[in-house]
Design a protein with these regions (language model features):
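Residue- and microsegment-level detector for short, conserved "hotspots"
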Residues: 98
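Phosphate/pyrophosphate-binding loop motifs in nucleotide- or prenyl diphosphate-using proteins
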Residues: 101
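N-terminal, polar/charged subdomain of small-to-medium soluble alpha/beta proteins
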Residues: 1-88, 92, 104-150
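An anionic oxygen-ligand recognition environment, strongly enriched in 2H phosphoesterase
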Residues: 95
Length: 150
């Protein structure tokens, strides 16, 4: 499971011209699943995201977590995080998980993330063509991979 976290002042997802979800201060999480992902990956990743200290404290030091600042989370499915570009110039997405496997993983991730932060998590729509708009704060962007635990 791969995730790209972006600390945002605001973010939103628009589908077919209609805003589906939006958040103010918090995290935009782009989430990519593969067939080998498990609930163990979800548990590790959601706990790490909830406790990662990437928000500024009073001294301007990144020393607070999403839990500390009470921020929101917007999760967007992103199969392109599994792009392989070893051969040619057109990315291959063979490592991206199948729809049958990744939809339940994505839904489980959202549920567990809600439990970790104690409030609803906003989402995009799995498999939809989306317009994601964000104001990156910092900018702070973190890439995570559950297989490497980094």
């Amino acid at each position: 499971m791969r995730a790209v976290l972006q600390r945002v002042s605001r973010a939103s997802v628009t589908i077919d011209g209609t805003v589906k979800s939006k958040i103010d201060e918090g995290l935009l999480v782009l989430l990519g699943c593969e067939n080998a992902d498990t609930m163990e990956d979800i548990t590790w990743l959601t706990h790490k995201i909830a406790n990662l200290r990437i928000f500024n404290d009073e001294a301007g030091v990144m020393n607070k977590s999403i839990l500390d600042v009470g921020g929101d989370i917007l999760v967007v499915s992103q199969f392109t995080l599994w792009a392989s570009y070893k051969k040619g110039n057109r990315p291959s997405y063979l490592r991206a998980g199948s729809h049958e496997v990744t939809v339940p993983l994505y839904e489980a991730f959202v549920r567990e993330m809600e439990q970790e932060i104690g409030k609803p998590v906003m989402t995009g729509e799995f498999g939809a063509e989306m317009k994601v708009e964000l104001l990156n704060d910092g900018p702070v962007t973190i890439c995570m991979d559950t297989k490497n635990k980094e």
